[in-house]
Amino acid sequence: MLVILSAIVPVGFIILIGVIAGKILTVEVHSLSQITVYILAPALVIDGLYRTTLSASNIGLILLGFALISLVMVIVVEIMAYCLSLDDDTRKSLMAAAVMPNNGNMGLPVASFALGAAGLERAIIYMIGSSILLFGISPAYLLGKSFLSGFRLVFRLPLIWSIFIGISFQTFSFHLPLQLDKSVSYLGQAAIPLALIILGIQLSQQKLAIGKLELLGVCLRLLVAPLLAFAIGNSLGLTGMDLKILILQSAMPTAVNTVILVTEFGGSAALMARTVVVTTLASLLTIPFFLWLLKVYL
């Protein structure tokens, strides 16, 4: 239990600092988010891929596992929306809540604290898949456009270009001169605490309200998704750390950026904001549970 607490308490502590900062300071969250998205997160990806010990097979299976989990979750939500006769905005919001995990602000720190460097490098791979879904495919879905237009959006992301750079450095054994690799590493390390602080600030600006749809979002995001990850991971033959990361990252709460997405591209922003808060708070209970399961059974 102490090992599990030592993984989740540091994460909760930094989020709490962000909540306090959001209450007592005048903080421009948008600027902090831009720094993370355009500088720190790409640096983390470049550094992670540059130093990775994972094989192409490992990387491919983790990404395939994420894609299959997302696809099944989409089907589940569409069926539930039809059975519950949900309106279009509510359906889109529930879809965003269920399918888009917070792998950046929450997933990477938890993986780092709980599973160390081996877990973090795999969590970065998972985050690449979720970023493509969150910032590329999802806007196209919410707008009712084709997936081709979604992939056009994907290639505007700095994170995608950082993937190409990181893979190129690793493939051709390119070494940055003048210890610039350390600079990239330091920038990447800054992404994790800043992401948690941003999450805390964003939570401080939202109201807590729990209704049936919010609870449904919690069940889908925090319970169904990780159980589905276990089933799909086993069917793909994933074992050890690869399977642990697939399950753990699938157990993350709803991504904070979904509020921005539904506001801009369609959906209920109010429902989305409430769901983000509820799933994030609930995840502080469910994540330790899944960490315990991973420790005992995997």
What residue ranges belong to the model's regions?
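Alpha-helical transmembrane segments of multi-pass small-molecule/ion transporters
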Residues: 1-298
